[in-house]
Curated annotation (Swiss-Prot):
Keywords: Golgi apparatus, Membrane, Transmembrane, Transmembrane helix. This is UDP-N-acetylglucosamine transporter TMEM241 homolog. It comes from Xenopus laevis. Belongs to the nucleotide-sugar transporter family. SLC35A subfamily. It is a multi-pass membrane protein. InterPro entries: TPT_transporter. GO terms for cellular component: Golgi apparatus; membrane. Golgi-localized UDP-N-acetylglucosamine (UDP-GlcNAc) transporter that transports UDP-N-acetylglucosamine into Golgi lumen.
């Protein structure tokens, strides 16, 4: 694997770890399980910071083309599906289990790419897809903390992630940059999640949240919004400064560090079969990075 750009890569890993730990703390420890509000808040904070950075000239955003914005709206809908379903899944599943299921999104994107773009894949990538599918498929059979709702939302999440990757790849010819797309995602998410907060019952239920006036909740929510934006920005910088293979390598490292440390800080019941499933998922992603690098 290539790990050039250590400063950018390590910064990305730090924000990745901090963001997931903060989200897990708010969702699972404090049990603030109202995704329209939590994700709406995160996208609002991210959108405001991104807008301010744009206005003061720190970042460049160009969303003047209405046709490009309209063409990107399906991506916005998939983005909302990713963060909403991901929030509900992460609140119920341990981080290593969530990552293993999340990685299975490669199976979805691989299927669509074969169907739509007729892409030929090297045998090593096919093997990695097999490992990712096998590990994700065996997880519910060997998870002593099996949660049906958590797995259901994880499946929705991974499907949206896979479709988002394919859709993003199909829009490469457009004039929207990664930051442009993310800015539109933020605006769309704030509006849609805000409108959905009352019909889903989250707005009323949140008024009875036991930690509503506690500083731990306030600081956790503020940190989650800021860290989410910083993680997004670090990811964009990583993609722009390094190759796609190097970006995938750092993403893999960030997941390994986050999943490993989560075993210390968050509750998880590890058994031998579950551990083998998690290791198979990690091996599958490592082989996928290797396949992207070598092309064989």
């Amino acid at each position: 694997m290539y790990f050039r750009g250590p400063a950018v890569g390590l910064t990305f890993c730090c924000f990745y770890l901090s963001s997931y730990f903060t989200n897990k703390y708010v969702l699972s420890v404090l049990k603030f399980t109202y995704p329209t509000l939590f994700q709406g808040w995160q996208t609002l904070v991210g959108g405001l910071i991104l807008h301010i950075c744009w206005k003061v000239g720190w970042l460049e955003i160009n969303c003047n083309s209405r046709s490009d914005v309209v063409l990107w709206l399906p991506g916005c809908a998939l983005f909302v599906g990713i963060i909403y379903a991901g929030s509900r899944a992460l609140s119920r599943l341990p981080i290593p289990v969530f990552f293993t299921l999340h990685n299975a999104a490669e199976v979805v994107s691989y299927g669509f790419q074969r169907l739509l773009f007729r892409e030929k894949c090297p045998y090593s990538k096919i093997f990695s897809i097999f490992l990712l599918l096998l590990s994700a498929g065996c997880l519910p059979l060997h998870d002593p903390q099996f949660d049906a709702d958590g797995y259901f939302w994880a499946v929705i999440h991974l499907f949206c992630v896979g479709c988002y990757k394919v859709f993003k790849k199909s829009q490469k010819s457009g004039s929207l940059s990664d930051l442009d797309q993310q800015y539109i995602n933020y605006v769309f998410s704030v509006v849609l999640l805000g409108l959905a907060s009352h019909p889903t019952g989250d707005l009323i239920s949140a008024l009875e949240f036991p930690f509503l006036y506690f500083y731990r909740f306030h600081s956790g929510c503020c940190a989650s919004g800021i860290l989410g934006f910083l993680l997004m920005l670090a990811s964009v910088k990583l993609r722009s400064n390094l190759s796609s293979v190097q970006h995938a390598s750092w993403n893999f490292v960030a997941k390994v560090i986050t999943a490993g440390l989560s075993l210390i800080y968050f509750q998880i019941t590890l058994t031998v079969p579950l551990t083998l499933c998690l290791l198979a998922g990690g091996l599958g992603e490592a082989v996928l990075v290797y396949a992207e690098r070598t092309g064989v």
